Amino acid sequence: MSRVCDITGQGKSFGNKVSHSNRKTKRAYLVNLHNVTLVSDILNRKFKFKVSSRTLRTVNYKGGLDLYLLNTSSRKLTDKAQKIKKLVKNAVAKGVKVSL
């Protein structure tokens, strides 16, 4: 079970633990992941994701899953998120209205 965000692909990062005496030892910083269900208003579907806290805040700030995916570059999304983005784009092209 990997600790990677399903939308952005953000994984664990590495750095140093610094003691009081300024000794440095390598350590890993894990991503703060949450199991969430995000709703696509355009597709009228629910999607389950393991999402980092930062990504969840960004999705809420952008106005929901649909608007986040449409306004985010595909290079910044995982394969799973790109597939959902493609479904949303196709639905918008068929005439489903996007509410802002």
Curated annotation (Swiss-Prot):
GO terms for biological process: translation. The keyword Transcription does not apply. GO terms for molecular function: structural constituent of ribosome. Keywords: Ribonucleoprotein, Ribosomal protein. Pfam families: Ribosomal_L28. InterPro entries: Ribosomal_bL28 (IPR026569), Ribosomal_bL28/bL31-like_sf (IPR034704), Ribosomal_bL28_bact-type (IPR001383), Ribosomal_bL28_sf (IPR037147). Disulfide bonds: none annotated. One of its GO terms (cellular component) is cytosolic large ribosomal subunit. Belongs to the bacterial ribosomal protein bL28 family. This is Large ribosomal subunit protein bL28. It comes from Ehrlichia chaffeensis (strain ATCC CRL-10679 / Arkansas). The gene is rpmB.
